[in-house]
Structure formats: structure tokens, C-alpha cells
Amino acid sequence: GYLALILAMDKKYMEAYGADADKVAAYLPVSGQTVTHFTIRKERGLPNGIPIIDEYAPVNRVRKDTPPVILITGDRNLEMADRWEENALFASVAKNIGNKKVTLHELQGFNHGTVLEPACFLIINYIREH
């Protein structure tokens, strides 16, 4: 999820390989971190559980004009700590800057470890419809 979001929002990563992030039909991250990834925080010796929003945070790179971004998370009461809230923040920031192509789906009854299977049905349906 995190990698899909950072590639979608910060075009420099795909441009380095001659690709345009805006040519991707859609981004469909499942339970992705929208703040700086915990691995980066760990490498920096920062405490776990405290979000960092810096140049490595997809939410800090939200753009107005993107392909569709379909955020999929598990149930906010069952997901990893703050994961649904991070995605809700991402969707809110996108909306506030005028990006109408970001949507958030919360899959009730599923947690971080069980959300992928039902998320695949959403992804398949999206592909079939578009």
C-alpha cells in the first residue's frame, strides 16, 4: 500500500525509470501507510507509534491531478493502530486540494491480516468496470 501511494503521489520515483505516474490507470493500495513508513522511522531511530509526515509520507505529497486512487482498509476498530485514520486523513487532504479521484473504502469486520482477500474483490470489480 505504501509503495503504491508514494509512487502515485511523488512522480520522481517513476520518472527515474522513464515512466509517468499519471499514465497508470489507477492505484489501489490496501491498508497502506500514508505517513512516513515505519521502516524509514526505524532506520532513523525514531519511536514507533508516533507518525512522521515528511518527504517520505504519501500524505505530504498529495496532488490535485492524479489517476484514481482507491484506498482500501480494514475496519477502523480492527485495523493496525491508526491505519484507517491515516487513510481517512489522506482522503481528506486530497478532497481539500480539489482531487476528486481519491476514495476510501473501509471493509467492516476485517483487520490488517484479513483485509486483502475481500479487497481483491473490490480491485477485480474496479478493473472490470474500467
Regions found by a protein language model. Give the residues of each.
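Acidic catalytic loop of the alpha/beta-hydrolase fold
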Residues: V35-T36, D75-E85, G113-T114
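Periplasmic peptidoglycan-binding/anchoring modules of Gram-negative envelope and division proteins
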Residues: D54, V59-K64
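Short alpha-helix in the alpha/beta-hydrolase fold that links the catalytic acid
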Residues: P58, P67, A81-N96
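Extracellular/periplasmic catalytic domains that process cell-envelope and extracellular macromolecules
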Residues: D20-D22, V62-D65
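Short, flexible loop segments at the rims of nucleotide/cofactor-binding pockets, characterized by
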Residues: L46-I52
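C-terminal catalytic histidine-bearing segment of alpha/beta-hydrolase fold enzymes
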Residues: I72, A88-H130
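Primarily recognizes the serine-hydrolase "nucleophile elbow" in alpha/beta-hydrolase
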Residues: G1-K42, I53-D54
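Short beta-strand/loop motif that positions the catalytic acidic residue
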Residues: D65, I70-D75
